[in-house]
Amino acid sequence: MKKLTLQEKQNSADALLKRINALHKPGETVRLMEVCGTHTVSIFREGLRQLLPSGIELVSGPGCPVCVTDQTYMDKALAYAERDDVIIATFGDMLKVPGSYSSLSEAQTKGAHIHVIYTPLEVVELSKKYPEKKIVFLAIGFETTIAVICATVKAVHAAGLKNVFFLVSHKLVPPALRALLDKQEGHIDGFILPGHVSVIIGEEPYQFLPEEYHIPSCIAGFDGLEILSAIANILEQRKTSNFIVGNTYHSVVMQKGNPVAQAMIKEVYDVCDDAWRGIGVIPNSGLRLKDEYAAYDVERALPIHLERPSLDPKGCQCGRVLQGLIKPSECPLFGKSCTADHPVGACMVSVEGSCAAWYKYGYSSGGSTWEA
């Protein structure tokens, strides 16, 4: 793809904004939900809210895998971390995610064996380095990450490793969108669909949006022009009432996605119901290791019982933020007891979290309040 010059980018942006303004009816409010944490960050970094007509409202959805990881899952991870014979392997952004009573970073200061890894396949090396320990990998993430973790499960199985286990809490994006629409708590006029997830699953899993709910959507890339192009596409659908799954990320996302990755996921996992932080259990929105790989499912191989109930942080509105019902700045804890240095909720922990993005980029020009 040709790299645009700065002037060409400016010209393209001007043309897209002119098109968006022409498609938007003055006085009409249009609420579009971006379903990707990377989109949330890009929208802030590129200053897109300030460029769009005032009636177009961009709200963040459940697009951050760390943020949607359920409280009970974190409590289970912490329970395994307390075992002397266990090493927790995890991505770094999970360290500060609060459980009901602690976090992995706090557990680490108290002696828990926690290793931050950068690729899932590192668990193979950990298992060989510490053969006397049980390596428990915190397997979270959307479809993009799932495909990579599938390869790790198969590698562990092929190597015959007996000391590697997975605490699984993968999430599937399309069922979450259906759940949001079924709840009908917050009005959504269209979805800006995630680029990376769509590389794996393609366009077809989103077809229920236009066919059943008559709502426009568009798969988008991650720079400002690609997001503006998706917004224009959605507004065009609204104007013509010709609702489809748009795709302005054709260079990367194919209609049928990545069949090889899809086949691998089906080989390793079964679909199951799963709990999303602040939202509850969503049917068919999670994955569970197939019986063939049950020996690597830590909850089946090394079952534990949580002695205390899982509790959401008092006052935290993360669940409402994830559903687009409120903006982060409308949470009473935001910027007060909940900050980037001292996060109370998961949405403030991850760099892709809505609250973290609002905290970093959403400061008003006055320097004392956040833009609402």
Question: Whereabouts are the PLM-identified features?
Answer:
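Internal helical hairpin/lid segments
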Residues: 229-320
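Phosphate/pyrophosphate-binding betaalpha-module
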Residues: 138, 142-205
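Hydrophobic alpha-helical scaffolding
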Residues: 6, 67, 138, 142, ...
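Metallocofactor- and cofactor-centric catalytic cores in central/energy metabolism, strongly enriched
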Residues: 1-132, 146, 156-158, 167, ...
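A conserved active-site cap/scaffold subdomain adjacent to cofactor or substrate pockets
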Residues: 167, 185-254
